[in-house]
A protein has these predicted regions:
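Glycine- and aspartate-rich repeat motifs characteristic of hemolysin/RTX-like Ca2+-binding segments
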Residues: 75
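Nucleotidyltransferase catalytic cores
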Residues: 1-15, 156-160, 167-202
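Short, charged/polar low-complexity linear motifs in solvent-exposed/disordered segments
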Residues: 78-80, 145
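Conserved catalytic core of two-metal-ion nucleotidyltransferases
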Residues: 39, 43, 92-151, 155-185
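Short, structured coil/loop segments at alpha-helix boundaries
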Residues: 21, 25, 42, 135, ...
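N-terminal regions immediately upstream of nucleotidyltransferase
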Residues: 1-71, 80-90, 94, 115-118
Length: 202
């Protein structure tokens, strides 16, 4: 049991070193919320209820320190409702216009093929992907092709994140069942211990 605890403490230490620091994570979250509020507040979207949310590693809490001189990559989606008639190019151009004239992000905007990138000075950038809802119940969306000419690729960042969370919980439950069945020397893991072990890998 002592060996198991020692091994876990080493793994947890490694995970904590790989993660975004709490201060940088807080800063990234605040900046994401600022951009989301700025976009939604634009008059163009006064009658359109946008949905904005993180995707990828930032949503899953699996963001790790990049190699060499690379930056942290924070991704989020600006999602139009199902009945919206706005094209990918129109939504993309509105995001660019808003951020280039909001008094904060003017010189930080970089145009990418399928997303708008905001570059920050402290080693991370934020990629904003246009999207449109396909099925609000299943969270399926459609995102643009590389030319931003049409809604083309189907995606489901929220659905994948929910699946990932369930798999992580299932893995811990299976692990507990395994040890409970085959090793009578292993102490019962409390719910709090399970959460503390799971969190750094999410």
């Amino acid at each position: 049991m002592k060996q198991t605890n020692y091994s876990e403490s080493i793994l947890l230490g490694i995970c904590e070193k790989l993660q975004l620091s709490p201060s940088l994570y807080k800063q990234a979250t605040e900046r994401y919320e600022t951009i989301a509020h700025t976009i939604q507040s634009d008059p163009v979207f006064k009658e359109i209820e946008l949905k904005m949310y993180p995707q990828g590693s930032f949503r899953l809490k699996t963001t790790v320190k990049p190699l060499s001189e690379e930056e942290y990559d924070i991704d989020f989606v600006v999602e139009l409702p199902t009945n919206a008639t706005m094209s990918p190019r129109q939504l993309y151009d509105h995001i660019v216009r808003i951020l280039r004239h909001d008094g904060t992000h003017n010189d930080m905007v970089e145009l990418k093929k399928r997303c708008v990138r905001v570059n920050y000075a402290n080693d991370f950038h934020m990629d904003i992907m246009p999207g449109r809802s396909v099925n609000p119940v299943t969270h399926e969306i459609i995102v643009p092709d590389r030319e931003l000419a049409a809604w083309y690729h189907h995606s489901n960042p929220i659905g994948f994140a929910e699946w990932f969370e369930q798999q992580a919980k299932t893995q811990i439950i299976d692990e507990r069942s395994h040890f409970g069945k085959f090793s009578c020397e292993v102490e019962k893991v409390t719910e709090q211990e399970v959460a503390s072990r799971l969190e750094p890998l999410r």
